[in-house]
């Protein structure tokens, strides 16, 4: 015990009793003197050679800042209806229609976070599609999120339809002197929706039908059919029947999508009975199961999709659970045996040139993610979609050469 006390006193004397010599011996150095500039703030002192940093010349790191998709300009599109654009991203933070794991209401913010490395400042050339959509003829914006209730599904459907209609029923920034495919040969802007659960497609199709005036073909990437008749979940009334597994049934009943030119791809879910397939046929769908890629390959999958929709106007809907959970674990109803993110991107690129009127990516529930891999996969798919939309404007007989310096 005595030895410990003597050691403690020795250290104390070394640090304090020997003063300057002791401190210097232990490696302590005096700081350089600090001078206060004349008329400098009295609250702190600065070195005499201090210079202000010019932050306007510094490129913000890709991991910082407020996230928009691809660092696009955030525009209040719904409150400022005079704002024009060619392609907009809009968040739909709604997941009241989920039947299993909730959390897709946080999908829009997660997808924006996943797009940080795809941005206007650091470069965004889509090499396989040979285009940079952020440096082209198109004005791209991020319109933020639609304010939507989570307590009343019927009211939410009305809110989402109204907001989507307001976005697309305006003049675009470009091609205003061309003919388009909407009513009166009008060219309209296009919207990429960030879900949210898959129920959001019903109000989207309703709004699209109002402006295009014709049923639209649907390409639906998913592990589930989503054509359930009301009553499979819930009590069967409208408020209970509309959900992320039945919205296509309602769209078909309302006549707002094609009766014979829709297609699912990536299907692999168990079904309640074989009558589910009868309901699916009644909704105008054909099915490509996920396992078919083993025999058909990517080119075969692409051919079946293109043959089905033909030259129709097409709405593209992607449920992130079309991917295998190894590539996208953060979703509400994961199913094993899905496609890889590489396979999905290759299939998607095979659809370039189709007449896409809009698209969505849904069912990302980031609470279940690992290392952001689901958000990254979803953001990359959205990047491919917007690249195709820019590469192929939805106009009639346009001279694309003056708009597309690297278009092929």
Swiss-Prot record:
<feature type="binding site">
    <location>
        <position position="222"/>
    </location>
    <ligand>
        <name>Mn(2+) 1</name>
    </ligand>
</feature>
<dbReference type="GO" id="GO:0033389">
    <property type="term" value="P:putrescine biosynthetic process from arginine, via agmatine"/>
</dbReference>
<comment type="similarity">
    <text>Belongs to the arginase family.</text>
</comment>
<feature type="binding site">
    <location>
        <position position="198"/>
    </location>
    <ligand>
        <name>Mn(2+) 1</name>
    </ligand>
</feature>
<keyword id="KW-0378">Hydrolase</keyword>
<feature type="binding site">
    <location>
        <position position="226"/>
    </location>
    <ligand>
        <name>Mn(2+) 1</name>
    </ligand>
</feature>
<dbReference type="InterPro" id="IPR020855">
    <property type="entry name" value="Ureohydrolase_Mn_BS"/>
</dbReference>
<dbReference type="GO" id="GO:0008783">
    <property type="term" value="F:agmatinase activity"/>
</dbReference>
<feature type="signal peptide">
    <location>
        <begin position="1"/>
        <end position="21"/>
    </location>
</feature>
<feature type="binding site">
    <location>
        <position position="224"/>
    </location>
    <ligand>
        <name>Mn(2+) 2</name>
    </ligand>
</feature>
<dbReference type="InterPro" id="IPR023696">
    <property type="entry name" value="Ureohydrolase_dom_sf"/>
</dbReference>
<feature type="binding site">
    <location>
        <position position="319"/>
    </location>
    <ligand>
        <name>Mn(2+) 2</name>
    </ligand>
</feature>
<feature type="binding site">
    <location>
        <position position="222"/>
    </location>
    <ligand>
        <name>Mn(2+) 2</name>
    </ligand>
</feature>
<dbReference type="GO" id="GO:0046872">
    <property type="term" value="F:metal ion binding"/>
</dbReference>
<feature type="binding site">
    <location>
        <position position="319"/>
    </location>
    <ligand>
        <name>Mn(2+) 1</name>
    </ligand>
</feature>
<feature type="binding site">
    <location>
        <position position="321"/>
    </location>
    <ligand>
        <name>Mn(2+) 2</name>
    </ligand>
</feature>
<keyword id="KW-0464">Manganese</keyword>
<keyword id="KW-0732">Signal</keyword>
<dbReference type="InterPro" id="IPR006035">
    <property type="entry name" value="Ureohydrolase"/>
</dbReference>
<protein>
    <recommendedName>
        <fullName>Putative agmatinase 3</fullName>
        <ecNumber>3.5.3.11</ecNumber>
    </recommendedName>
</protein>
<dbReference type="Pfam" id="PF00491">
    <property type="entry name" value="Arginase"/>
</dbReference>
<dbReference type="GO" id="GO:0019627">
    <property type="term" value="P:urea metabolic process"/>
</dbReference>
<keyword id="KW-0479">Metal-binding</keyword>
């Amino acid at each position: 015990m005595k030895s410990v006390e003597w050691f403690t006193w020795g250290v104390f004397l070394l640090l304090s009793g020997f003063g300057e010599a002791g401190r210097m011996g232990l490696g302590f150095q005096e700081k350089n003197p600090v001078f206060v500039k004349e008329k400098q703030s009295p609250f702190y002192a600065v070195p005499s050679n201090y210079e202000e940093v010019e932050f306007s010349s510094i490129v913000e790191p890709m991991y910082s800042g407020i996230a928009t998709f691809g660092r696009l300009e955030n525009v209040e599109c719904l409150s400022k209806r005079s704002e024009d654009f060619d392609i907009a991203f809009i968040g739909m933070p709604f997941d009241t229609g989920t039947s299993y794991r909730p959390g897709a209401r946080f999908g829009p913010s997660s997808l924006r976070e996943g797009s940080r490395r795809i941005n206007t400042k650091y470069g965004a050339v889509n090499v396989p599609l040979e285009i940079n959509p952020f440096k082209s003829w198109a004005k791209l914006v991020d319109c933020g999120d639609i304010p939507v209730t989570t307590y009343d599904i019927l009211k939410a459907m009305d809110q989402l339809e109204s907001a989507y209609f307001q976005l697309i029923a305006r003049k675009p920034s470009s091609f205003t002197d061309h003919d388009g495919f909407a009513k009166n040969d009008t060219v309209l802007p296009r919207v990429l929706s960030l879900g949210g659960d898959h129920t959001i497609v019903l109000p989207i199709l309703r709004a699209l039908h109002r402006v295009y005036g014709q049923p639209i073909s649907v390409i639906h990437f998913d592990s589930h059919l989503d054509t359930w008749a009301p009553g499979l979940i819930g009590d069967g009334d409208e408020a209970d029947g509309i959900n992320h597994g039945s919205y296509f049934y309602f769209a078909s009943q309302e006549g707002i999508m094609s009766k014979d030119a829709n297609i699912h791809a990536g299907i692999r879910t168990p079904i309640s009975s074989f009558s589910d397939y009868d309901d699916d046929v009644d909704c105008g769908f054909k099915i490509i199961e996920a396992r078919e890629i083993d025999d058909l390959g990517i080119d075969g999958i692409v051919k079946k999709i293109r043959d089905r929709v033909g030259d129709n106007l097409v709405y593209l809907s992607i449920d992130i659970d079309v991917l295998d959970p190894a590539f996208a674990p953060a979703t509400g109803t994961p199913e094993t045996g899905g496609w890889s993110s590489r396979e999905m991107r290759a299939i998607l690129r095979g659809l370039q040139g189709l007449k896409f009127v809009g698209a969505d990516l849904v069912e990302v529930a980031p609470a279940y993610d690992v290392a952001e891999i689901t958000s990254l996969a979803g953001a990359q798919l959205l990047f491919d979609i917007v690249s195709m939309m820019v590469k192929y404007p939805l106009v009639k007989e346009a001279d694309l050469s003056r708009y597309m310096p690297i278009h092929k």
